[in-house]
């Protein structure tokens, strides 16, 4: 893990780049960030604030913008963008992720809003509005699926050793089948 894990390397190098950035050595922070991107395929702006315990899994293509904040215990999968929707300097342009958030592969979280603690963002979702704590956002454009149904489903799924963050309320046959199986198991 220490020698061959790009997510770990990117976070280690980001901490150095962030320290340089905050100390006023902007060029050095950007340079370390650039080297990190070249080595890992993960682009984290040196101004981004990333708490301890963040996990970037299969991180190729992850982009985290300058004013983004990522809370403790958050998991980010491949191809995720925490991006901005404005070029305004001095403004909060990138999202804030609370604690223990899961962001699925390919998701785009765009803008200066908050994704609450324990929220989930489904794979390939495009989120442009706040996500409440404990909720799940899925789709393009993202919509919030019922938190109480999601909580019951997640509890049943965890008893089976399965993470159901990608199970949606969509009417497509595969989603209906997955919901039915997990809801049936929940009893």
PLM features: residue spans?
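Left-handed beta-helix
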Residues: 40, 45-46, 51-52, 57-66, ...
């Amino acid at each position: 893990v220490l020698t061959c894990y790009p997510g770990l390397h990117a976070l280690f190098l980001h901490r150095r780049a962030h320290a340089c950035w905050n100390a006023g050595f902007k060029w050095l922070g950007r340079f370390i960030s650039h080297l990190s991107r070249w080595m890992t395929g993960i682009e984290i702006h040196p101004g981004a604030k990333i708490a301890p315990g963040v996990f970037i899994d299969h991180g190729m293509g992850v982009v985290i913008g300058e004013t983004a904040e990522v809370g403790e215990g958050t998991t980010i999968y491949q191809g995720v963008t925490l991006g901005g929707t404005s070029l305004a300097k001095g403004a909060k342009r990138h999202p804030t992720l609370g604690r223990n958030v899961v962001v699925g592969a390919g998701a785009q979280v765009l803008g200066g809003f908050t994704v609450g603690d324990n929220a989930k963002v489904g794979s390939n979702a495009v989120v442009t509005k706040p996500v409440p704590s404990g909720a799940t956002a899925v789709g393009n454009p993202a919509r919030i699926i019922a938190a109480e149904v999601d909580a019951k489903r997640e509890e049943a799924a965890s008893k089976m050793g399965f993470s159901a963050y990608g199970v949606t309320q969509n009417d497509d046959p595969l989603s209906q089948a997955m919901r039915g199986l997990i809801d049936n198991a929940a009893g």
